[in-house]
Amino acid sequence: MIRGGDIAKGTVLLHKGAPYLVVEREFVNPGKGAAFARVKMKHLRDGSVLTQTVKTSDTVEDAVVDSHRAQYQYDDGECFVFMDTRSFEQIFVSKGNVPGRERYLREGDEYDILIWNGESIDIKIPTKMVFRVAHSEPYLKGDTVSGATKPVTTETGLVVRVPLFIKQGEKILINTETNEYQERVND
């Protein structure tokens, strides 16, 4: 059990028997009445988001979630297959549990897999990742009518808007939380 005042971003809680990841917490101390925390949580199975209000004096149940470092191997159609880097056992993560994550997975890269009640429920994607640009339209001088960015496709199929000077084959740093270009990366 965890007190409402101790809930922090990144904590995994049980709500109605399901695991939720706290993505945002705002502490509110009204002039009158008890202090409370407004907690925004993401369901770790289906990705739905809900906001809950918890009094700081109340207790909530925290979920026991294990994290395993694993190397991404391949996509078998229904699951993403990883190999635990310590035990070398295969870990299967259902695509239904992690919609949209395939664009951030590269064979051989390591990720943290969250396991709850023996089930792989989430893949922790690093906040910033480097990708190689697989496809980019050429930049034509003076072609700034449409703005100073253009869409490019990375090696994993992720489409990101980047400045016009980015060329095919270059490496770029992407913020995976906002899906935005950060900077060009030199080899």
From Swiss-Prot:
Function according to Swiss-Prot or TrEMBL: Involved in peptide bond synthesis. Stimulates efficient translation and peptide-bond synthesis on native or reconstituted 70S ribosomes in vitro. Probably functions indirectly by altering the affinity of the ribosome for aminoacyl-tRNA, thus increasing their reactivity as acceptors for peptidyl transferase.
Name the UniProt record assigns to this protein: Elongation factor P
Organism, scientific name: Treponema pallidum (strain Nichols)
Keywords: Cytoplasm, Elongation factor, Protein biosynthesis
GO terms (BP aspect): peptide biosynthetic process
GO cellular component: cytoplasm
Matches recorded under PROSITE patterns: EFP
Listed InterPro entries: Elong-fact-P_C, NA-bd_OB-fold, Rib_uL2_dom2, Transl_elong_fac_P/YeiP, Transl_elong_KOW-like, Transl_elong_P/YeiP_cen, Transl_elong_P/YeiP_CS, Transl_elongation_fac_P
Pfam families, A to Z: EFP, EFP_N, Elong-fact-P_C
Regions annotated as coiled coil: none
Coarse class of the protein's main subcellular location: cytoplasm
Pathway(s) it belongs to: Protein biosynthesis; polypeptide chain elongation
Subcellular location field: Cytoplasm
Example GO molecular function: translation elongation factor activity
Family: Belongs to the elongation factor P family.
